[in-house]
Amino acid sequence: MTAQLPGILSRRSLVKGVIAALSGLGSGPFVTGQEAKVPGRATEAEEIAKVEKLLRAARLGPLHNTRSAHFLAVGDAPESHQRQALAVCEALGEAFLVHFRGRGFTVEYPDLRLTVIALRDQDSYAALLADAPGKDVGGHYDLETNRLVIFDFRSQQAAIVAQAERVNLFTLVHETAHQLSFNTGILNRQVDLPVCVSEGLATYVELWRPGVKNAIGGVNRPRIEALRQAVDWIRIGDLLVDDTAFEPKTEQLAYAESWLLVHYLLRASSRQPRFRQYLAEVQGSNKPADRTRIAEKTLGPLAKLDHELKDEARKYLRG
């Protein structure tokens, strides 16, 4: 899963990296020690060993690892960069939990720290992928392994150093939002989930900024700009049922409508129970054929929801 901010910044300028973000956050509460063994799950030491084996196979090194209260960083990025990245993750995680608890969700961190593979630069990222990353790729959250992969963008794009803080923060926040969504009780990696739901949550969070009150859930102007630039509309019923809208031709609009959907459902307290019920029902299904039934049951008639979202879009486009 990768972030794309339409209109104002291309995915190339948004990209990679992350670790340089926000020295003003400080190093945060970093700790050492191992987690207790959880049946069926790797211990922290085992996780470090697995990641280091993967990185050494890509001929990366020297390797370091850094811990914060809820995150574990492993990679060839310097420890100072790892600490800065984890400080961002911790600050976002705290705001994330507060925000979603305030909207009726039961959310908690998992027992074990979340893994962040923190790489030195784009070359290290390419080595890990065993392929040159596309110009639109800027780190990613790996749904299968449940790991966030980031790298330091500054060394590759000296020409935009002045933008580095914004670029790095956006990328890190979007991808960490995915990791938090799938690990705090909102989403489940093991079920069939429409892409628009996971991307809608990530875009709902992606403009978070440290030290800004109520920074999660604000109006996402770049996504609105993508709606403005679009010449078409993807019916919400189609977006919830068919993930092909996230192919390159229509992905900008798909991201924008995903943000609009989640923002609309969470903005008003009267709609929040519908969204919580929808997510709870989705947790119990792993069949794509169930998508329409679950959405209609919990969110109401999809044609009506589509009409409401078009009205919502028009309101923002007039603003």
Describe each region flagged by the PLM.
Residues G28-L54:
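C-terminal segment of N-terminal export signals and the immediately downstream linker at the start
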Residues M1-S10, A20-S23:
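N-terminal secretory signal peptides
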Residues L60-R189, P194, S285-K297:
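Juxtacatalytic substrate-recognition/specificity segment
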Residues A20, L25-P29, N183, W208, ...:
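Short hydrophobic alpha-helical membrane-anchoring segments
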Residues H140-L148, V167, N188-G319:
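Acidic/His/Gly-enriched intrinsically disordered linker/tail segments
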